[in-house]
Regions:
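Immunoglobulin-like IPT/TIG beta-sandwich domains and homologous Ig-like subdomains
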Residues: 36-97
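Long, low-complexity, intrinsically disordered N-terminal extensions of eukaryotic proteins, enriched
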Residues: 14-18, 86
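Beta-strand/beta-sandwich contexts
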Residues: 19-51, 99-118
Length: 119
């Protein structure tokens, strides 16, 4: 009986350590180039993602920090968007042990500057 319990415990431990990275929500879902404030905060929500390593490879976009909370289900990314950054799509690459997941993210072109808006 003891062997069965220990085997079950080992299986549970291994299955959670190799759990698939699954992002359920990302806010904001996209952003714009040409904004006055160059820092962008992105919130990721998914089961046990706080220990993921993050990589972003897009010209003009730099990951300045990734912050996890007490809840292992949230991860906040702080990006710096350079003034010359071109609109386009890139992947937010998450990795943990042997698992990898790419989350597509869009930087759209800003059509009207905020100071020129009427209303």
């Amino acid at each position: 009986m003891k062997k069965i319990f220990l085997s079950f415990l080992l299986f549970c431990t291994l299955s959670t350590s190799y759990a698939k990275i699954d992002i359920e929500r990302i806010d904001p879902p996209f952003w714009w180039t040409g904004m006055q404030d160059r820092e962008l905060q992105i919130m990721l929500y998914g089961k046990n993602i706080a220990d993921c390593k993050i990589k972003i490879d897009y010209p003009g976009v730099t990951l300045t920090k990734a912050v996890s909370l007490d809840s292992k289900n949230y991860l906040f990314l702080y990006l710096s968007i350079a003034p010359e950054t071109q609109p386009g799509n890139f992947d937010i690459q998450l990795s943990r042990k042997r698992e990898k997941q790419n989350i597509p993210y869009a930087l759209n072109a800003r059509t009207i500057q905020g100071k020129n808006r009427k209303g």
